[in-house]
Amino acid sequence: MAPSLSTAVSSLLLLLLLAAAISVSSSPPMPEDSIRVISAEKRIDLTSPIVKVFLTLKLENDATAPEASQVLLAFTPTEVEHLAIVKATRAEGKRKKKIYVPLSVKASDLAAAPNGARLYSILLSTPLKPAEVTTLEVFYALTHSLEPFPAEITQSDPQLVYYRDSAVLLSPYHVLEQVTYIKMPSNRVESFTRVDPTSRAGNEVKYGAYNNQLPNSYVPILVHYENNRPFAVVEEFVRKVEISHWGNVQITEQYKLKHGGAQHKGVFSRLEYQSRPSISGVSSFKNLLARLPPRVHSVYYRDEIGNISSSHLRSDSHKSELEIEPRYPLFGGWHCTFTIGYGLPLQDFLFESDDGRRYINLTFGCPLLDTVVDDLTIKVVLPEGSTSPQAVVPFLMEQYLETSYSYLDVVGRTTVVLKKRNVVGEHNVPFQVYYEFNPIFMLAEPLMLISAVFLFFVACIAYLHMDLSIGKS
């Protein structure tokens, strides 16, 4: 009895293993099995405090694989933490007729790659057919990825930073050939990791070419170099946009700014700073450039003390540039707060859609150039009586509504609040806020003002005709 039972169990296990093998063999190939990277070129720009990476991928789908509707990108956990934006385009056409079609990029729902790497999906406009070859251009920006070393410097020291990455492309696909270029702001490169073949020409280090890299390959490298660009970090940025249908858009921007580079140690000598500008405080910054909308008016720049006169405005019909100077130069770890305000002509920014709704068209992001915004808030205050507000922004963010009150308001003004963290210059794109508005509400405040004046005169007349004298009883 026992031998027959053992034989039955063995036969059952054999059938289960055979079924599992058939299931695995008939299942569609995984993405890393069906797509391969023919060539990859990675260019890393370290000339500013923001790390900018340009990636060119030439991909081929396997001849026996089904159509691929997406391409996966892999990022390390550290890169995901500091990732500000990812954009991708696909090259279509040949030579002079070649165009680059923007593609949607989002975090993938697939399981993470080895070592905690996170996958992002590039959604292709048209599926990649079997044996088809295509080229993708990818751009992404990393903030707070440069580590000052030494962490503290004196007024006369240059600023040195570390940058960590991989000599080979981290990818879920098999990479046949690849090369990486790292560009620094100057020729002063203290050291860099060598992974043969590695070469250096001036301010650029080249890694590769490397051939036949397996999926999820990673070779850590470290670059130590001089970067004296101002590490301007806006810890908190709040923009308030107030719309008046009487002809004006008033904008108020509040900044909490800090120098995010190597911490300043020792005393500060203004005499040395002014007499030796090429040596003293080379990594500090004493002015900033803000790119404002065209045709701005009534511009002011002030801090908690009062107006700051050290600013210069250049404005025309195409752009406006405001150069501002804080009351003191900013060194590593130093902070300052200030406010910029200006007005805009209503007819240039408020429009009416085909369905009768009104919408304001503005630029998202921070107007200060080459800055990182840790926490950004935009408040669009709609005219009193506005209903059905809707914000259209080309990327994910937090949105909610609140009510604001101003002079002569009765029910308050609907305010659309937009919040986003880790904002860079590539986020400075147009966005719209749609709303419905009954023109009768434009008469509310004038009627209240007229009524108040009328009641005041009635009270004055009544007072003049009142007999307040004390008569004899």
From Swiss-Prot:
Pfam families: Ribophorin_I. One of its GO terms (biological process) is protein N-linked glycosylation via asparagine. It is a single-pass type I membrane protein. The keyword Glycoprotein applies. Glycans are attached at N307, N361. It is found in: Endoplasmic reticulum membrane. Residues 1-27 form the signal peptide. Residues 28-439 are lumenal. Disulfide bonds: none annotated. One of its GO terms (cellular component) is oligosaccharyltransferase complex. Residues 461-473 are cytoplasmic. The keyword S-adenosyl-L-methionine does not apply. Pathway: Protein modification; protein glycosylation. Component of the oligosaccharyltransferase (OST) complex. PANTHER family: DOLICHYL-DIPHOSPHOOLIGOSACCHARIDE--PROTEIN GLYCOSYLTRANSFERASE SUBUNIT 1B, RIBOPHORIN I. Belongs to the OST1 family. Subunit of the oligosaccharyl transferase (OST) complex that catalyzes the initial transfer of a defined glycan (Glc(3)Man(9)GlcNAc(2) in eukaryotes) from the lipid carrier dolichol-pyrophosphate to an asparagine residue within an Asn-X-Ser/Thr consensus motif in nascent polypeptide chains, the first step in protein N-glycosylation. N-glycosylation occurs cotranslationally and the complex associates with the Sec61 complex at the channel-forming translocon complex that mediates protein translocation across the endoplasmic reticulum (ER). All subunits are required for a maximal enzyme activity. This is Dolichyl-diphosphooligosaccharide--protein glycosyltransferase subunit 1B. The lineage of its organism: Eukaryota, Viridiplantae, Streptophyta, Embryophyta, Tracheophyta.
